[in-house]
Regions:
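N-terminal redox-cofactor-binding region of secreted/periplasmic oxidoreductases
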Residues: 1-148
């Protein structure tokens, strides 16, 4: 049996980032576990085909509990390399500034928008966007859908 310094459970967006950062230390061994596979279905590579992901092998196919007026509501969650980020139509959405500032105001110092902005910028590669708000050298390419 192999020994690992860290075990990261879930190869979704956050799990992959955490595992990558931890593994940058040559003295650290990281195991990244994921329940699903690494296959890339059409709905994962073509934004307009995202509905193909729903109910597929890449979707845990979760649903809410029974709702009073609507029955259960589908709650798709990604199963596989990339997690829910692999089945969400390639949409990259940052929270609103007010949400982060609300966290800081509620007693979470260091979690305000201006505190987190440098972290967001380090993660993004958003060429042609406002450099005061977007990064240009990060690993996550962010931009409009090609051809739109």
């Amino acid at each position: 049996m192999e020994d690992f310094s860290y075990v990261v459970v879930g190869a979704g967006t956050a799990g992959c980032v955490v595992a990558t950062r931890l593994s940058q230390d040559a003295d650290v061994r990281v195991l990244l576990l994921e329940a699903g596979g690494s296959e890339r279905a059409r709905g994962m590579t073509m934004p307009n085909a995202w509905p193909d992901n729903l109910g597929s092998a890449a979707d845990w196919a979760n649903a809410t509990t029974e709702q009073a007026e609507a029955g259960p509501v589908a709650f798709p969650r990604g199963r596989g390399l990339g997690g829910s980020g692999a089945i969400n139509a390639m949409v990259h959405v940052r929270g609103h500034r007010a949400v982060y500032d609300g966290w800081a105001a509620s007693g979470a110092p260091g979690w305000g928008f201006s505190d987190l902005l440098p972290c967001f910028q380090r993660s993004e590669q958003a060429a042609g966007r406002d450099p005061a708000l977007r990064g240009i050298g990060g690993p996550v390419r962010v931009g409009p859908v090609p051809g739109e």
